[in-house]
Amino acid sequence: MIERGKFRSLTLINWNGFFARTFDLDELVTTLSGGNGAGKSTTMAAFVTALIPDLTLLHFRNTTEAGATSGSRDKGLHGKLKAGVCYSMLDTINSRHQRVVVGVRLQQVAGRDRKVDIKPFAIQGLPMSVQPTQLVTETLNERQARVLSLAELKDKLDEMEGVQFKQFNSITDYHSLMFDLGIIARRLRSASDRSKFYRLIEASLYGGISSAITRSLRDYLLPENSGVRKAFQDMEAALRENRLTLEAIRVTQSDRDLFKHLISEATDYVAADYMRHANERRVHLDQALAFRRELYTSRKQLAAEQYKHVDMARELGEHNGAEGSLEADYQAASDHLNLVQTALRQQEKIERYEADLEELQIRLEEQNEVVAEAAEMQDENEARAEAAELEVDELKSQLADYQQALDVQQTRAIQYNQAISALSRAKELCHLPDLTPESAAEWLDTFQAKEQEATEKLLSLEQKMSVAQTAHSQFEQAYQLVAAINGPLARSEAWDVARELLRDGVNQRHLAEQVQPLRMRLSELEQRLREQQEAERLLAEFCKRQGKNFDIDELEALHQELEARIASLSDSVSSASEQRMALRQEQEQLQSRIQHLMRRAPVWLAAQNSLNQLSEQCGEEFTSSQEVTEYLQQLLEREREAIVERDEVGARKNAVDEEIERLSQPGGAEDQRLNALAERFGGVLLSEIYDDVSLEDAPYFSALYGPSRHAIVVPDLSQIAEQLEGLTDCPEDLYLIEGDPQSFDDSVFSVDELEKAVVVKIADRQWRYSRFPSLPIFGRAARENRIESLHAEREVLSERFATLSFDVQKTQRLHQAFSRFIGSHLSVAFEDDPEAEIRRLNGRRVELERALATHESDNQQQRLQFEQAKEGVSALNRLLPRLNLLADETLADRVDEIQERLDEAQEAARFVQQYGNQLAKLEPVVSVLQSDPEQFEQLKEDYAWSQQMQRDARQQAFALAEVVERRAHFSYSDSAEMLSGNSDLNEKLRQRLEQAEAERTRAREALRSHAAQLSQYSQVLASLKSSYDTKKELLNDLQRELQDIGVRADSGAEERARQRRDELHAQLSNNRSRRNQLEKALTFCEAEMENLTRKLRKLERDYHEMREQVVTAKAGWCAVMRMVKDNGVERRLHRRELAYLSADELRSMSDKALGALRLAVADNEHLRDVLRLSEDPKRPERKIQFFVAVYQHLRERIRQDIIRTDDPVEAIEQMEIELSRLTEELTSREQKLAISSRSVANIIRKTIQREQNRIRMLNQGLQSVSFGQVNSVRLNVNVRETHATLLDVLSEQQEQHQDLFNSNRLTFSEALAKLYQRLNPQIDMGQRTPQTIGEELLDYRNYLEMEVEVNRGSDGWLRAESGALSTGEAIGTGMSILVMVVQSWEDEARRLRGKDISPCRLLFLDEAARLDARSIATLFELCERLQMQLIIAAPENISPEKGTTYKLVRKVFQNTEHVHVVGLRGFAPQLPETLPGTQTEDTPSEAS
């Protein structure tokens, strides 16, 4: 018996609490006991990690996380490791006694994600003496050790002889090694397998019934029947391939038009490009010649434009220069006109102001006289008023003093003081210091006499003053007039200067009278001078335009000559238009005819091509439409004969095929129903029994059995008698023979053998004579021989049928071609060649174009000459009337002479205009200038002094009179005399006072009224003086401005200046207009030159490019033509009808064909590449290569042994026959490969029965398992009702659903899925395809339902669910299920693994304290019976008497955490023996 492999130990290196710890594992149960956090789960996690190093699956959670879908970020592994390199290693011994150490190197990855890096490895050939901890650690001293890295471990193991170290990059390779060496029970090929294994371990670890496993027990317990599935898949693949081949043949048969389409599109694609290049080459040659002609024409035009530009530029320069001088002259004329207008306005102002000044001067003189008289009267009134005032004051003083003296005694003293005061004033005024009251009277007379004398002297001086003042005024007036005319001068010179001025004034007045005649004469001469200058300019311009200088005498003769030339050129131009119209009309007619022929030419060419093809196909030459219709009648007769012969051959071929099919039935049964009846009756066909008879014996046995050679041999006829009742589905004659099929012989008949015949004695009264058949078919050898001869005959018939079919098709195609020709081309095929007519008309068109170009050139020259002559006549028409002006050479001198005289006259006119009035005034008073009244000033001084003396004498006389009057105050009389005397005096004084006051009032009134009048007179005088001075000043300013202007302001000056300005403006406008015309013409000429230059450059570039293109295309075209001729495709590519299409139409035709070709050759890499290369427009030869490649490809696609023509289209038609034969063969092959639905159902039923038996065997091992109230555990396997119905229909009712299984569009899997949907319409299939559903239905596991049942207490058999069981019962039941799964995996894997290996069995159980002692004992018993290892963990020792128990205690020593481990073996009668190496604590050492 093969010994089962075992796990020897688990080693943890640098885990949390375990620096270097090796746990020796018991052969049955290893218990880990300890409190919470002691390290039990860490130890199991290390074991699981080494077993399944897949981070996507590992998730170590505590019991509070049970069933959680997510835990901590590191899935519980990162926190169980320490920093640095960590190891988890499993030491195993397999069935071959090979020691294998498998494990993983773990290392924390720095970062927030708390990731762990895992590297699996395996060690083989390690000696038993070497411990795992010695491999991965290096001892530094007694208390220090270092963990080796994986590379160091590899180097260390490489030094050990016979030890193999393997590091794995994939988990699949790691598990593959473990499976091959017997460490795990199942080959884990994929992540799905690893997930199942991990879920099993996880379910074992955490205990209970795992819903993840119970829901998918079929995947865990039932092995995949891959052989059956692969057989189905291979069969379906063969059928699919066969159907695809058939479909491809059908597509090929239906793609005959596609191949024709490929040839047609390839021809269109290449021929269109070929003809386009041919057309372009011809067009490029024509364009190159046209470019060259246009280049020469443009050069001539550019030269003419350049000459024209130089002439216009020169004329424009002259006009620009003339414009500057004209603008200056025009501006000067405008300024002169403005000055003249200004001078005229100034002159008008001066005249107006002079008239105003004369009037003001008269008024001023009159007002001076009035003011002088008023002033004298004012002086008199002032003196009179002053005297009256003094007299009143004196009288008032006297009267007041007298009143005061009368009133009081003191009045005398006041009067005396007043008398003394009056005496003092008199002394002062009269300059008499010795004056006394007594002498006052004498002095009064003296001073009154002096006053009288002064008054008389004043009156005398006043009379003299009046006379002198008149003479002085006349002299000053005359002097001012002379000074105004001549300027400042001495008074003594005034007389002489005045006489000279009067004489000069007479002369100036005479000259001024000549201004107007001179001005009119000058204006006339200037007008003639300007006309002369204009005529000279016109003559110069005419000579310049004519390019020749002409004398004045030659102009009239030239005028007549130009008019004659105009008349002759006009006739030529008018006749040229008619000639040009006739040429153009003929050209248009030719063009229209050519266009009509070009439209007709493609139709004619297509008809000719069709006619040539018909001639080639039938080998006849046709010259008329009647011959074509006659030949068509012959074709119809030939076609009918060929069809009759083809149908006869086809009927014979079908008969041979039916015979071959009948002879090809398995077992020699010619009727399929015989096989079904033989199976039904439990017998064997007689033909099967004699299937191995030799070919030589076949005639004998065929004659021996005769009609009964298709009998069924059954063991007992009596047993099938009942089955014969009501039998209808059978041949008309059914022979049944009783006998043992294994030892059957021919002893049932009595037979006599004759020559090539036998006599069979069926009964005493019935014999049968049968001759040996010439073609026996009894026995496999005879049938095969007959089938072989039939196949040979069938090949001959097929070939003949194909030939006849091809001939018929060829005749039909030819008939169709004739019909198409008659319908489309017969009306034009036998007409004249339009291309020859086009060539003739093109020659005539070229001649017309050349004649038209010559005519246009001549006509243009005549038009130019005509325009030049008309322009010359127009210029002469303006010049001839001015010939007399051109001949007048003294005109300019006369103008200068008159201009000088006019200047003198205008100067005199200005003098007369300025000083004429002064001279007129001076003439009557010039005589007063002879004597100068110089004494007038002295007289005025004497008069003023006399007036002052008279005023002083009057005051002195008045003062002395007052003293005399107060003389009484100096001595008083007595009171009475004083009163009487005073009374008289008072009365007198009062009367005198009244008279004096009245006089004073009158004097005041007169003075006041005369003062107001004097003030009024003075204001008027001041106003007149101010106005006079202002206007005088303005007049002086105007005269100065007029002198500054320097222009003669006469009556005709403005008209002449305006006329001159207008003439210059007209000249300037004409000059500018001509300049603008020249500038526009010059701009147009420059633009034309620039356009011509650009055009010339473009033409040169285009010509060179076109020439290079022509040269390059010539080389490429030669290569294309050489390739075309070498491959013999010129006839197919040179399609003349395409020559009449435009390049765009040909390019469009080629592009459309290219698009169709891309689709057509998409599946052919070679043609696709050649087509892609042919798309290069610069390499036209590649299109030829593609065309040749298409024809070569079509030739290669057709079998060479049946090709009878070089035309691939005809060869494709011949291939139709071969494809038809292949279709028939593949159809028969598909019938042979067809899957029987009944056989499928039988296979699935047998597989289900086998697996049900295997599950029953597994249940026998679980009958004695009990946990708590659970007495037994079993697996219940049932077939689903829907799938059972499907199997029944497949077995018994398949005929009802043959529409699915006989469909060529559905595979068997798809048909099966459709049948399932038809039987179960209530089931939603979701998004799955019928193929997927069918493949699932071919898997027997999908037909089964599995569930776990437990026999619990009084409830009997119940479905195992966690809610119906206690925790311990659920753990035990789940463990039982897991043991079944492991055992099932081992059974499934025996055929994959070596027969000499029994894999390790190990499960886990965490928190085992939830089981009672009986359940624990059951587990121990189950492990012992199944040779399974179990690792359990519990807070305390569960069953230390069995297996191996480890006590784990986590301690902290010097801030270092470690786990203290003590291990004990199971109890025995002897004292318990401590396991080696576990008595000391596992004190961790610091890694160096």
Swiss-Prot record:
<feature type="coiled-coil region">
    <location>
        <begin position="1209"/>
        <end position="1265"/>
    </location>
</feature>
<feature type="coiled-coil region">
    <location>
        <begin position="326"/>
        <end position="418"/>
    </location>
</feature>
<dbReference type="InterPro" id="IPR012090">
    <property type="entry name" value="MukB"/>
</dbReference>
<dbReference type="InterPro" id="IPR007406">
    <property type="entry name" value="MukB_N_dom"/>
</dbReference>
<keyword id="KW-0238">DNA-binding</keyword>
<feature type="coiled-coil region">
    <location>
        <begin position="444"/>
        <end position="472"/>
    </location>
</feature>
<dbReference type="GO" id="GO:0009295">
    <property type="term" value="C:nucleoid"/>
</dbReference>
<dbReference type="GO" id="GO:0051301">
    <property type="term" value="P:cell division"/>
</dbReference>
<keyword id="KW-0159">Chromosome partition</keyword>
<comment type="subunit">
    <text>Homodimerization via its hinge domain. Binds to DNA via its C-terminal region. Interacts, and probably forms a ternary complex, with MukE and MukF via its C-terminal region. The complex formation is stimulated by calcium or magnesium. Interacts with tubulin-related protein FtsZ.</text>
</comment>
<feature type="region of interest" description="Disordered">
    <location>
        <begin position="1049"/>
        <end position="1074"/>
    </location>
</feature>
<dbReference type="GO" id="GO:0006260">
    <property type="term" value="P:DNA replication"/>
</dbReference>
<keyword id="KW-0175">Coiled coil</keyword>
<feature type="coiled-coil region">
    <location>
        <begin position="977"/>
        <end position="1116"/>
    </location>
</feature>
<keyword id="KW-0547">Nucleotide-binding</keyword>
<comment type="similarity">
    <text>Belongs to the SMC family. MukB subfamily.</text>
</comment>
<keyword id="KW-0132">Cell division</keyword>
<comment type="function">
    <text>Plays a central role in chromosome condensation, segregation and cell cycle progression. Functions as a homodimer, which is essential for chromosome partition. Involved in negative DNA supercoiling in vivo, and by this means organize and compact chromosomes. May achieve or facilitate chromosome segregation by condensation DNA from both sides of a centrally located replisome during cell division.</text>
</comment>
<keyword id="KW-0963">Cytoplasm</keyword>
<dbReference type="Pfam" id="PF13558">
    <property type="entry name" value="SbcC_Walker_B"/>
</dbReference>
<dbReference type="Pfam" id="PF04310">
    <property type="entry name" value="MukB"/>
</dbReference>
<dbReference type="InterPro" id="IPR042501">
    <property type="entry name" value="MukB_hinge_sf"/>
</dbReference>
<keyword id="KW-0067">ATP-binding</keyword>
<feature type="region of interest" description="Flexible hinge">
    <location>
        <begin position="666"/>
        <end position="783"/>
    </location>
</feature>
<dbReference type="InterPro" id="IPR050308">
    <property type="entry name" value="MukB/SMC"/>
</dbReference>
<dbReference type="GO" id="GO:0003677">
    <property type="term" value="F:DNA binding"/>
</dbReference>
<dbReference type="GO" id="GO:0007059">
    <property type="term" value="P:chromosome segregation"/>
</dbReference>
<dbReference type="GO" id="GO:0005737">
    <property type="term" value="C:cytoplasm"/>
</dbReference>
<feature type="coiled-coil region">
    <location>
        <begin position="509"/>
        <end position="602"/>
    </location>
</feature>
<dbReference type="GO" id="GO:0030261">
    <property type="term" value="P:chromosome condensation"/>
</dbReference>
<feature type="compositionally biased region" description="Basic and acidic residues">
    <location>
        <begin position="1051"/>
        <end position="1065"/>
    </location>
</feature>
<keyword id="KW-0226">DNA condensation</keyword>
<dbReference type="InterPro" id="IPR032520">
    <property type="entry name" value="MukB_hinge"/>
</dbReference>
<dbReference type="InterPro" id="IPR027417">
    <property type="entry name" value="P-loop_NTPase"/>
</dbReference>
<dbReference type="Pfam" id="PF16330">
    <property type="entry name" value="MukB_hinge"/>
</dbReference>
<feature type="binding site">
    <location>
        <begin position="34"/>
        <end position="41"/>
    </location>
    <ligand>
        <name>ATP</name>
    </ligand>
</feature>
<dbReference type="GO" id="GO:0005524">
    <property type="term" value="F:ATP binding"/>
</dbReference>
<keyword id="KW-0131">Cell cycle</keyword>
<protein>
    <recommendedName>
        <fullName>Chromosome partition protein MukB</fullName>
    </recommendedName>
</protein>
<feature type="coiled-coil region">
    <location>
        <begin position="835"/>
        <end position="923"/>
    </location>
</feature>
